[in-house]
Amino acid sequence: MQGKEIKLSDYKGKIVLVVNTASKCGFTPQFAGLEELYKKYSSRGFVVLGFPSNQFANQDPGSNEEILEFCKANYGVTFPMFEKIDVNGENAHPVYTYLKNSVPNAEPEKIKWNFTKFLIGKDGKTLKRYESRVKPADIEADIQELLK
């Protein structure tokens, strides 16, 4: 949220977990698990990228600054958080347009809810999509496998 543009290619060589987030959602406590994964594996080349979105039941209505402060104060978030974006529709951010169309062996599908996660390999290819109900801890084995 520093106002500079970042590309997914900036993270080439890292394992990346991209997540659309919201601060007033039943899945909001997943911030804690995401931060735990980030702290545990960031030194080994893993990063979480958080993209706030207000597209689902207005569950992230705050300003970018308010969202960042909420995440830090309530969940100790230190992983990169970006400006609020749309993940679906004609104004969908290009990162999400790409992600939705790049999951192997899956039809492109719109994001259904907050905390949908995409796992990207070191080569920049999208490997897997996890729906909202999948907790960060449930992804850990996949991350460990990629870090071998």
PLM regions and their residue ranges:
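N-terminal "domain-start" segment that seeds a small globular fold
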Residues: 1-9, 94
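Surface-exposed acidic, glycine-flexible loop patches that form ligand/cofactor-binding
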Residues: 7-9, 39-40, 104-110
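Conserved helix-turn-beta segment immediately C-terminal to the redox Cys motif
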Residues: 9-15, 24, 28-52, 71-75
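Thiol-based oxidoreductase modules, predominantly thioredoxin-like and allied folds used
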Residues: 20, 45-64, 78-89
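Soluble non-cytosolic domains of exported or imported proteins
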Residues: 25-28, 89, 133-134
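Extracytoplasmic/secreted proteins, especially bacterial periplasmic and envelope-associated proteins
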Residues: 33-36, 62, 66, 90-94, ...
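Short, internal strand/loop/helix patches
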Residues: 65-114
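Thiol-/selenol-based redox modules, centered on thioredoxin-like
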Residues: 94-97, 101-148
